[in-house]
Amino acid sequence: MRGTVLCAALATLVACQRVDNTPPASQSPAGTDTGMKVAAPATPPPPTLPSPPTATKVAVVEGFLTPESVKYDTAQDVYFVSNVNGGPLTKDNNGFISRVRPDGAIENLKFVEGAHNGVTLNAPKGLALRGDTLWVADIDVVRAFDAKTGAPRDSVSLASLGAVFLNDIAVAPTGALYITDTGIRFDDVGNVLHPGPDRIFRIGPDRQVTVAVRGDTLGRPNGITLDSVGKRFIIVQFGGRSILAWKPGEKAPSVIAKGPGGFDGVEIAGTRLLVSSWADSTVSSYETGQEVKVITGVPSPADIGYDAKRKRVLVPIFTGSRIEIWQLP
């Protein structure tokens, strides 16, 4: 305020000095007004910054049953979609994984199907790929399938460590798997309970299972992804509002950004850090530490995927039995 008043005063002073250079009244021609007033120049309005470009919806693929996660396989140029097909903690062996082509055509709705061909799959959620192996988080077990044939390859139970709600998986360069345990259950009427604890498990290349990190700072951890540039993992809170960074060996993660909360999926898309939120039905970028909405109007956006070849965000609509494909600008 003081700066504005000072500028106005200086402008008026300059204007008055210009007026004082006019001839005195006695020398002025008759009828000439020598009391001319000069207004201070108006302060120009601040420039209007353009809104950040948003993504464009290019396809909607329907026909799924509670889709939770989408993962892009660069080697096969195909999308995998996990289908819970029921309660997220129900061991009913009716979960399945779909194969979808980038044009939106469902190549095989039940590429991997519980209770078929020797497969056990209850409520599949987060997906991860390493080579031609597709890893799947399934309540308290992590399962592996051949990404080309769908045949079962491996199964690692975390039940003995008290796993409650295995949610998402990320693969380290060493081949170790890091799996979030959101630590939630549901009562008979569907209310969310949080018996905890909040943890991230590690499955080593030797299949040895350990607790990599635990604690309330994880905030019901949901999505996890590897930041290969920062040599760290990015973790998002479902029960809080924080986006976290963590390196193996650290006792606790650090907060790198905050947003609306209710976070589910996280992907690094080029230079963008993309996070989906149930709280406001969006996918936003946080690479600067500030929220920038990229996709809006997506209810229950679960564990998003990213098609790096086409620069597309793959959004599973958990309660809508569909996935939406969005083109980044």
Ranges and model annotations:
Residues S82-N108:
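Beta-propeller domains
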Residues T43-P67:
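A short helix->beta-strand "capping" segment at the edge of beta-propeller domains
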Residues F64-Q76, G87, A115-T133, S160-R185, ...:
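Beta-rich, blade/repeat-based domains predominating
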Residues N85-L89, V141, I184-D188, G240-S242, ...:
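Short glycine/acidic-enriched loop and turn motifs that connect beta-strands
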Residues C16-V19:
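Bacterial signal peptide processing site
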Residues V100-A105, D146-A151, I203-Q208, K247-K251, ...:
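Short loop/turn segments that connect beta-strands within beta-propeller blades
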Residues N93-S98, V141-R143, D198-F201, S242-L244, ...:
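A short loop-to-beta-strand structural motif that recurs across blades of beta-propeller domains
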Residues A55-V61, I106-G118, A151-A159, Q208-G215, ...:
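A short beta-strand motif characteristic of beta-propeller blades
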